[in-house]
Amino acid sequence: MPKMVLLPRMTMALGGYIRETTFPYEEDDEVKPFPYRNVIVGNPTDEPIKIEVPAYNEGWIERHKKLGLIVVPVNEDDDFVGLFQMVKEKVKNAKRE
């Protein structure tokens, strides 16, 4: 799977890195849509972290939370700018190691 580096103390939206219609690496023949419009990811650490792109399923969110990232899925009716600013503040205020 392709990867991208999320730099230390960086926040970004993965709207362009979401595969919306299929899980190409699963053997399940049923096509399932990705349940979110966007995903906001923040790296509160002082180390770069590799993330998998594109996001294919909800398991992506849990896998990346385990890496120490702040991961916030965005639904159609959510306030994207407000959520992005919230994650940005959490990253900014995270304790330095």
Swiss-Prot record:
It comes from the Archaea. It holds the Pfam family Ehbp. InterPro entries: Energy-convert_hydgase-B_suP. To M.thermoautotrophicum MTH1236. This is Uncharacterized protein MJ1436. The lineage of its organism: Archaea, Methanobacteriati, Methanobacteriota, Methanomada group, Methanococci.
